[in-house]
Amino acid sequence: MLESLINPKRAEKGPWKMFFIGLLYASISLLMVHFLFGGDPVLSKFSGLIVVLFCVMFSIPFMYFIFKQEEMEDEEMESLLGVWRIHKDAIYAFLWLFLGFIIAFTVGYILLKDPNLLNAQIETYCNINSPGQVNDCVAQYSFTGNTISTNALENGTRFVSILGNNFGVMIFTLVFSLIFGAGAIFVLAWNASVISAAIGIFTSYKISEIPLGLIRYMIHGFPEIAAYFITALAGGILGVGVIRHGIGNKKFVRVLLNVIALIFIASIILVGAAVIEVYFTPLLFQ
């Protein structure tokens, strides 16, 4: 029913509209998991994954429509500047969708006070920031723990850890979007939920502190997720290009070169985001 009420074509003329779609889909996902699975002794343990899966199901029509449209436009572009110009609206639409996910996940998680809703995301956060003390970290940063922000790793080690994790996500996004274009939304929705969990930790689960938490994580989060979106777009475009033209067609070669250009841009952005996260953001939020 949702895909009938909300037409993906509307996102073409106003990428900002995707913000409200992200808010709606993430909110519905949280509420469904909280009320349908919150009391289940087995499924409640996997609430963090189920929330993301619901978001993925809701978002697939938009992702497929955008990938299809972008591949058709990509066939005629050859320059790097031209590649950015024709794809920037799609990237902006993804970023607005991502922001909607983050705000809905963060607010919903804090208001519902269900520690299982983003349980896997909290563990992921701890695995990145405190790899040697994951269990202690999870206990500390849950609703029942005392949320005290600490930096468990030295900057150099943390930079390598974060950059390695980010490039791993980037490769996974590329492969996932190539195999099943719209499937890359899983990686993107998952990252939105992890950032939401991190914002909850940073704000000590206080609604009034959410704007500060958003600033804290969006300084590096927006360029980072933009790199993932560009990668997802590249994989989706390549997948559709193979289906439409095969691998021997001249149009496919043009599409392939543009995809390589997009991945190069994404890689540069990802390195910059890691530098900001490790060396710049801590100076503002000590």
Can you name each region flagged by the protein language model?
Residues 1-63, 104-111, 200:
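Transmembrane alpha-helical insertion/packing segments
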Residues 7-20, 42-50, 82-99, 256-264:
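Alpha-helical transmembrane segments and their helix-start/interface "positive-inside/aromatic belt" motifs
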Residues 65-84:
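Membrane-helix interface/capping segments
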Residues 86-160:
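Hydrophobic alpha-helical segments and helix pairs
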Residues 95-112, 179-186, 220-223, 266-268:
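Hydrophobic alpha-helical membrane-insertion segments
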Residues 145-196:
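Internal active-site segments that recognize and position negatively charged phosphoryl groups
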Residues 199-267, 271-272:
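Hydrophobic alpha-helical transmembrane segments and adjacent short intramembrane/lumenal linkers
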Residues 272-286:
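Juxtamembrane boundary at the C-terminal end of a transmembrane helix
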